[in-house]
């Protein structure tokens, strides 16, 4: 028997990066049972709503402010309905889940999170790359340019660039010229590989490759101005070393050399 989800709480569900089949199984089951769905219509693949019952109430949060979103959630829970807040990617990245959760808690409403596949994971899968290449990069920085939401001074692009490790930069493609300038100023060579992925895993996905020196012009020529992720680092280059984990002369708990 399939699980019946508690209607006394709000379910925050990560919608995944775009491909409707990349939602988690639990997220899919929640949509199948949802009676109220509040979704980020400007960001998610709305084909996901096809998983919902025909009679489910559907609200596009792109048209709403925070208080209106909370009121819809609260009204649904009060009516004993299964309420799903469907957000792009994974809700823990640029998802505003804390402010929504705190408002619900203040009203005495429980809430739970179902994680999703974030765009940086979908982009890597689409490109067939890994962020942690042995002897090239073993770290990944996820960040963004400041916008209406400021970025702490210690987290400026120049500071991160000094590490010259793998980077995934969200919400910044409209200012990619500035991104490239600041990364070079911070320490990345101008020849550092860059990939810009528009709507990763969507049918209309598009990838532009270049270097910090020329990526801005290439992205402009491609007409990409939003809904794109910027990947930066030598993990995109040709240098590669095999992991020691699978080396024939390497022993570990499960295998002797």
Curated annotation (Swiss-Prot):
* E.C. number(s) listed in UniProt: 2.1.1.271
One of the entry's Gene Ontology molecular-function terms is: precorrin-4 C11-methyltransferase activity
Which UniProt keywords are given for this protein, alphabetically ordered?
A: Cobalamin biosynthesis, Methyltransferase, S-adenosyl-L-methionine, Transferase
Q: Does the keyword Nucleotide-binding apply?
A: no
Q: Which domain of life is it from?
A: Bacteria
- Which is one Pfam family of this protein? TP_methylase
Gene3D superfamilies from the entry? Answer: Cobalt-precorrin-4 Transmethylase, Domain 1, Methyltransferase, Cobalt-precorrin-4 Transmethylase, Domain 2
What this protein catalyses is:
Co-precorrin-4 + S-adenosyl-L-methionine = Co-precorrin-5A + S-adenosyl-L-homocysteine + H(+)
Question: Which biological process terms from the Gene Ontology are attached to this UniProt entry?
Answer: cobalamin biosynthetic process; methylation
User: PROSITE patterns of this UniProt entry?
Assistant: SUMT_1, SUMT_2
Q: Which InterPro entries match?
A: 4pyrrol_Mease, 4pyrrol_Methylase_sf, 4pyrrole_Mease_sub1, 4pyrrole_Mease_sub2, Cbl_synth_CobM/CibF, Siro_Cobalamin_biosynth, Uropor_MeTrfase_CS
Q: Under which main EC class is this enzyme filed? A: transferase
Q: In which pathway does it act?
A: Cofactor biosynthesis; adenosylcobalamin biosynthesis; cob(II)yrinate a,c-diamide from sirohydrochlorin (anaerobic route): step 4/10
This protein's record includes keyword DNA repair: no
Give the similarity note.
Belongs to the precorrin methyltransferase family.
In terms of NCBIfam families, this protein maps to: cobM_cbiF, PRK15473.1
User: What is this protein identified as?
Assistant: Cobalt-precorrin-4 C(11)-methyltransferase
Annotated gene = cbiF
């Amino acid at each position: 028997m399939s699980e019946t989800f508690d209607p006394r709480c709000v379910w925050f569900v990560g919608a995944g990066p775009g491909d409707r089949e990349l939602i988690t199984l639990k997220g899919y089951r929640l949509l199948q049972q949802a009676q109220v769905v509040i979704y980020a219509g400007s960001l998610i693949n709305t084909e996901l709503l096809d998983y919902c019952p025909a009679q489910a109430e559907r609200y596009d949060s792109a048209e709403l402010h925070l208080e209106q979103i909370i009121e819809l959630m609260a009204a649904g829970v009060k009516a004993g309905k299964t309420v799903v807040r469907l957000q792009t990617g994974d809700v823990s990245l640029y998802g505003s889940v804390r402010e929504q959760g705190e408002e619900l808690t203040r009203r005495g409403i429980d809430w739970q999170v179902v994680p999703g596949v974030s765009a940086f994971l979908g982009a890597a899968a689409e490109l067939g790359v890994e962020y942690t290449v042995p002897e090239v990069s073993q770290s990944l920085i996820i960040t963004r340019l400041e916008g209406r939401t400021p970025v702490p001074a210690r987290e400026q692009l120049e500071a991160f660039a000094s590490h010259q490790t793998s980077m995934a930069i969200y919400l910044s493609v409209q200012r990619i010229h500035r991104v490239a300038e600041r990364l070079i100023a911070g320490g990345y060579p101008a020849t550092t590989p860059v990939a810009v992925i528009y709507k990763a895993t969507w049918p209309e996905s598009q990838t532009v490759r270049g270097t910090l020196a020329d990526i801005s012009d290439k992205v402009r020529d491609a007409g990409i101005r939003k809904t794109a992720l910027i990947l930066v680092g030598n993990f995109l280059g040709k240098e590669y070393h095999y992991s020691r984990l699978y080396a024939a002369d390497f022993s570990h708990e499960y295998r002797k050399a």
